[in-house]
Amino acid sequence: YEIASCLVGSEMCIRDSWNPAIRRFFLKGGVREDRLPSPQLLAEYRLLSSRLQAVAVTRCMADRYPECTCGEHTLLNNIADCERTVNAMHACLLKVPWSGSGKGLNWCLHGFTKPVSNWCERVLREQGCLTAEPIYNKVKDFALEFYSDGQGEVRFAGYSVFSTNEHGAYTGNLLASDGQIEESIACCLSLEKLTGIREALRAELASIYGNTYTGYLGVDMMVCRSDKENGYRVHPCVEINMRMNMGVVARLFYDRFVAPGSKGCFAVEYVPDNETLRARHEQDMHDYPLTVEQGRLASGYLPLVPVTGKSCYRAYVRI
């Protein structure tokens, strides 16, 4: 059926992210051009979605908060720079400027090997540059979520504490209030410093995205162990996710559907064997019966998608 039939009145199409192919898909589905971003705007979005934006923001935050931040990005424009930097750092993480979430990463643990060289040459040929970062002694992944109104204003939308697998791909989120998340970070970074960094980030994002982009922005951060006095530092801008992201989904889910004071997890799980997946699902249904209080989840397991005889994934919350 036509996608246009789903839109009512002056409603606009809101995607988790945009590209020209998605725009063509909506046009083919009957959506009017005035409800979609223009090709010119998509070209601006492409520049704004580059990982190079995170490089600039990290430097800005490090200049403002040198006593409590870490974060180093080296921009590489040719294969000689790649070899020199990788060999000097011994172990590092290479990133392409544009890629999907959790993708476009190369963990260099054994120097500038032939596979690493081939990967760098391909990225330089296709995208023109890449970045190198140290591998940090990470304690916790978290994010600050923001919303840009496209009219110059960016507002804070909440915190996200998330988990990833060994390849950096997303696996889940903590379900907790903003206050509970602040408490969990406070052992590593004072609330005063956290709110200062949050406001500085908000202002910086407003100057970069505020007048062009309408939608959510997620700034991935991490707490790292340090040899400095307090033992911890925060990386203020690992990535900028210029889209609706899973951290926002978890934040909104908690605020709308979870009983105040409760905590839990929001998870996406891949299990290649369907029988094993269904067994886990049925065991969780048995072990964590769902309890609802005053229309909100107080405890238990809730699958967010059907687990069928063909499923290899499940998405669920457990309170």
PLM features per residue range, with description:
Residues 1-9, 13-14:
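Single conserved hydrophobic/aromatic residue that forms the stacking wall/gate
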Residues 15-21:
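Structural motif
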Residues 29-104:
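A conserved helix-loop-beta module that forms one wall/lid of the active-site cleft
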Residues 72-73, 91-117, 143, 166-185:
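Glycine-rich phosphate-binding loop of ATP-grasp-fold ATP-dependent ligases
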Residues 90, 114-171, 222-237, 241, ...:
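Phosphate-binding site of ATP-dependent enzymes
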Residues 126-127, 134, 156, 168-232, ...:
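A long amphipathic alpha-helix within ATP-dependent nucleotide-binding catalytic cores
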Residues 146-201, 241-268:
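ATP-dependent carboxylate/phosphate-activation module, predominantly the ATP-grasp catalytic core
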Residues 259-319:
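Peripheral (often C-terminal) accessory segments that flank ATP-dependent C-N-forming ligase machineries
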